[in-house]
Curated annotation (Swiss-Prot):
Belongs to the SAICAR synthetase family. The keyword Nucleotide-binding applies. Keywords: ATP-binding, Ligase, Nucleotide-binding, Purine biosynthesis. It is an enzyme of class 6 (ligase). This is Phosphoribosylaminoimidazole-succinocarboxamide synthase. NCBIfam families: purC. PANTHER family: MULTIFUNCTIONAL PROTEIN ADE2 (PTHR43599), SI:DKEY-6E2.2 (PTHR43599:SF3). InterPro entries: SAICAR_synt/ADE2_N (IPR028923), SAICAR_synt_PurC (IPR033934), SAICAR_synth (IPR001636), SAICAR_synthetase (IPR050089), SAICAR_synthetase_CS (IPR018236). It comes from the Bacteria. Its EC number is 6.3.2.6. Gene3D superfamilies: ATP-grasp fold, B domain, Phosphorylase Kinase, domain 1. Pathway: Purine metabolism; IMP biosynthesis via de novo pathway; 5-amino-1-(5-phospho-D-ribosyl)imidazole-4-carboxamide from 5-amino-1-(5-phospho-D-ribosyl)imidazole-4-carboxylate: step 1/2. One of its GO terms (molecular function) is phosphoribosylaminoimidazolesuccinocarboxamide synthase activity.
Amino acid sequence: MTNQLIYTGKAKDIYSTKDENVIRTVYKDQATMLNGARKETIDGKGALNNQISSLIFEKLNMAGVVTHYIEQISKNEQLNKKVDIIPLEVVLRNVTAGSFSKRFGVEEGHVLETPIVEFYYKNDNLNDPFINDEHVKFLGIVNDEEIAYLKGETRHINELLKDWFAQIGLNLIDFKLEFGFDKDGKIILADEFSPDNCRLWDADGNHMDKDVFRRDLGSLTDVYQVVLEKLIAL
């Protein structure tokens, strides 16, 4: 059925379209943290996230990365290929920060010699636990070959993103990706890429991402607007 709400999330709602293989994603003016324990409505945030993610996914598509992104259709809406989401958050860390620093008792800001890829099991009831390859296989999420693909593709995407952000004076600290199976059973990049799911620091170490909200550092939309303007100029 066309225009039927098929999923509602913390930051996005997803609707069906007249094409069974295409969905309409609507970005919300909502910021959350602690797995949704803290929520706040922030006017304009949805449009900024949508525009930033659209720009990034357009560049990834042009660079040969296969993604779910089709086109932006309004300031806070885009069309995407329908996928079966793999219940994994794939996190890549270039620099120590956030939960990584807390977990291992290391200071933020240490550049990792080799970027680290981590898996988190997407399960709200379990608070998205950190898991390893063996857990992924035990849970039947993906197989060895698919695990290797997820890691390799994430590292490839990281190299592209690091270069693009460096060109606009931003350091890509870490980020979270989600992947899904398309109608042909191929794994493709899904979800979004915005300051909601990555850490960006400027040359002075200022946070240009959702940590502004998490740590009460100022106006989230002001920071996101700066990131958007930098990406438009890229």
